[in-house]
From Swiss-Prot:
UniProt keywords, alphabetically: Cell membrane, Glycosyltransferase, Membrane, Transferase, Transmembrane, Transmembrane helix
SUPFAM superfamilies associated with the record: Nucleotide-diphospho-sugar transferases
Superkingdom of origin organism: Bacteria
Record keyword Membrane present: yes
Name used for this protein in its record: Poly-beta-1,6-N-acetyl-D-glucosamine synthase
GO biological process entries: cell adhesion involved in biofilm formation
EC code: 2.4.1.-
Compartment annotation: Cell membrane
Main location: membrane
Length: 412
């Protein structure tokens, strides 16, 4: 009976936790700071930022990203782009672009993964603060100012992660992911921030303190998701990570089922790799915030496998001629579906209300509010089934290379 209660109520509990955490974070930590009030004076002293752009087969997007960073008003900056052995004409495009623009270019011959590319790029960084961007990303002009200001206020910060938005919204998948980032992922980051530890920075857009990266050994070349891995290392070394929702960037997301599936399996595998690697180190820290974060990861994996076992049991023992059995099963299904739908409506309403100060058009996402979070749990369950065995087979000490990304329909 206890297992059944966990199966039924865990998603509901987590949704309520995200809702309450988001509301509290918004009114206490987010709303008091109006995103429109930011002083940018020519005489204002700012810390220098080294922008790192690691890319692999980004011939269609890299020029847009370079142009975006070069055009930023941020006064003290340098740009370092790393080509990680691309098999397309990415290197040629960068060399041609460099003829008329000032930036550093590290051209690696062999694809050894994003983490290795970032490790090579940071060797060229002149400043204490390092902004890591994906090569399909366009950032708002205000974003670096918001993020660097957070470091001034809190010397314990090791990283400030921004608020990614979706550029390509022409397809159904693009629209769904737009709402997902605005609601579910935003809720999770806000609630985790309150607990004191964020599971992962946004690999697409984060500002690091270089000395903090040096302390933790920079990025791990053998972890499939370098962003999750470095996030946990920062926590273990007593650095804090801040979520800065006012710092916006615009990125491309997969617009094919295959591309989206591959991305989500990689994310889940990376999270599981980190959990397996850092489990005992986390236990030894005796930090409640990390215990909460680790419990959330373990509980999610456990929930998935309980679902599999329970559904298998139902199929094996089902008696379609037993009216009492069918009535009981239908009652449980109806209750859980009604409860989840009700919670989903509240979660989406709260999340999209909060998000409307950054992107008002997302309010149309209300049409998804009765069903998408439920689908989110189903997708995550399927992803975990594929990803966890992969994480168990991770080869230590190698290079987690990357493949050509699915960037969807690029909208300029």
């Amino acid at each position: 009976m206890h297992i059944f209660n966990f199966l039924l109520f865990y998603p509901i509990f987590m949704s309520i936790y995200w809702i309450v955490g988001s509301i509290y974070y918004f009114f206490i930590k987010e709303k008091p700071f109006n995103r429109l009030l930011l002083v940018k004076s020519e005489h204002q002293q700012v810390e220098g930022i080294s922008f790192l752009l690691a890319c692999y087969n980004e011939s269609e997007t890299v020029q847009d990203t370079l142009s975006s960073v070069l055009s930023l008003e941020y006064p003290e900056k340098e740009i370092i782009i790393i080509n990680d052995g691309s098999s397309d004409n990415t290197a040629e495009i960068i060399y041609e672009f460099k003829k008329n623009h000032d930036f550093k270019f590290v051209d690696l011959e062999v694809n050894r993964g994003k983490a290795n590319a970032l490790n090579e790029g940071i060797k060229q960084a002149s400043y204490e603060y390092v902004m890591c961007l994906d090569a399909d990303t366009v950032i708002d002009d205000d974003a670096p100012f918001y993020m660097i200001e957070d470091f001034k206020k809190n010397p314990k910060l090791g990283a400030v992660t921004g608020n990614p938005r979706i550029r390509n919204k022409s397809s159904i998948l693009g629209k769904i992911q737009t709402i997902e980032y605005a609601s579910i992922i935003g809720c999770i980051k806000r609630s985790q921030s309150l607990a004191g530890a964020i599971n992962t920075i946004s690999g697409v857009f984060t500002l690091f303190k270089k000395s903090a990266l040096k302390d933790v050994g920079y990025w791990d070349t053998d972890m499939i998701t370098e962003d999750i891995a470095v996030s946990w290392k920062l926590h273990l070394f007593d650095y804090e990570i801040k979520y800065e929702p006012r710092a916006l960037c615009w990125m491309l997301v997969p617009e094919t089922i295959g591309g989206l599936w591959k991305q989500r399996v990689r994310w889940a595998q990376g999270g599981h790799e980190v959990l397996l690697r850092d489990f005992w180190s986390t236990i030894k820290t005796k930090k409640l915030s990390l215990y909460i974060l680790m419990f959330e990861q373990i509980a999610s994996i456990t929930w998935v496998y309980i679902v599999i076992c329970y559904l298998s049991f139902l199929v094996i023992t089902a008696n379609i001629l037993d009216y009492t059995y069918l009535k009981y099963s239908f009652s449980i299904f109806f209750f859980s579906s009604f409860t989840m739908t009700f919670i989903n409506i509240i979660q989406f309403t709260v999340a999209l209300f909060i998000d409307s100060r950054y992107e008002k058009k997302n309010i149309v996402g209300l049409i998804f509010l009765s069903w998408y979070p439920t689908l989110y749990w189903v997708i995550n369950a399927a992803v975990v089934i594929m990803a966890f065995p992969k994480a168990l087979k991770r080869k230590k000490g190698g290079y987690a290379t990357w493949s050509s990304p699915d960037r969807g329909n690029i909208q300029r």
